[in-house]
Amino acid sequence: MIALGIEGTAHTLGIGIVTEKKVLANVFDTLTTEKGGIHPKEAAEHHARLLKPLLRKALQTAGITMEDVDVIAFSQGPGLGPALRVVATAARALAIKYNKPIVGVNHCIAHVEITKMFGVKDPVGLYVSGGNTQVLALEGGRYRVFGETLDIGIGNAIDTFARELGIGFPGGPKIEKLALKGERYIELPSAVKGMDLSFSGLLTEAVRKYRTGRYRVEDLAYSFQETAFSALVEVTERAVAHTGKNEVVLVGGVAANNRLREMLKIMAEDRGVEFFVPPYDLCRDNGAMIAYTGLRMYLGGVRFKISDTVVKQKFRTDEVDVTWS
């Protein structure tokens, strides 16, 4: 079977086409601004403007037509309301026009589910992006959140710190590069709050120290990264210990960071569990993960009426009954 998926929860519009074992197309376009940040209205306008050309490109890349598609999936949430509504409207229109079944997909779950295309069975997932930071795993028929940010996502924290340092947006690659030149660790407050995480205190103190002018930016970048990532690894390790699972996956845009990958790999080796990171185009927000998850849901018996496709801006990961996995 072939599924087409449309992703549009935030600033990236993605369209993916997959089978159960292969990505046939995975195209996207990201709204970028000089100062960073996303205005929901601008994201919606971006998605509406690019939907047709991206759909055309995806179909051409896959070498198929809409008639060949068996199921249409879309990101139902969580995300920015105006952006989600553009995507949902497009998915409904395609489903009705071509008489195809439609499936609404939880964006966070899709980030973990796509790893199963590569043979991952039942992992603990660390999902790290601009707006989201979660440690999740399948337990009792739902993806349970074992730890999450209580304030801002790790990606937003990194980007905000980068803006304070005056090194621009996106900040992730630039902070990572600066951190490689760090020579000493500067003490910063832990981001661990029980099983959850809070990056606001860490960010505030790092910015305060920078503004004193007494510290090298390379050392601050190194210290910020080490402190934040240590917290992520600690909470992930606790989830592994609690669940007894033997696989850890790293997904989301911040999965591009090599230091975070290294730290998680060390933890996984110490605990004797497998560690996996998908190709980066399947880590970031993308349509292929929506298509793949929608296909798995459909094959597992999940069915949606058009009336079930209302978007959910605050769609919780643990709301979904996972009957297909």
Curated annotation (Swiss-Prot):
Substrate binds at Y127, V128, S129, G130, G131, D159, G172, E176, N257. Its cofactor is Fe(2+). It catalyses: L-threonylcarbamoyladenylate + adenosine(37) in tRNA = N(6)-L-threonylcarbamoyladenosine(37) in tRNA + AMP + H(+). CDD domains: ASKHA_NBD_Kae1_arch_bac. GO terms for molecular function: iron ion binding; N(6)-L-threonylcarbamoyladenine synthase activity. It is found in: Cytoplasm. One of its GO terms (biological process) is tRNA threonylcarbamoyladenosine modification. Required for the formation of a threonylcarbamoyl group on adenosine at position 37 (t(6)A37) in tRNAs that read codons beginning with adenine. Is a component of the KEOPS complex that is probably involved in the transfer of the threonylcarbamoyl moiety of threonylcarbamoyl-AMP (TC-AMP) to the N6 group of A37. Kae1 likely plays a direct catalytic role in this reaction, but requires other protein(s) of the complex to fulfill this activity. Monomer. Component of the KEOPS complex that consists of Kae1, Bud32, Cgi121 and Pcc1; the whole complex dimerizes. This is tRNA N6-adenosine threonylcarbamoyltransferase. It comes from Thermococcus gammatolerans (strain DSM 15229 / JCM 11827 / EJ3). The gene is kae1.
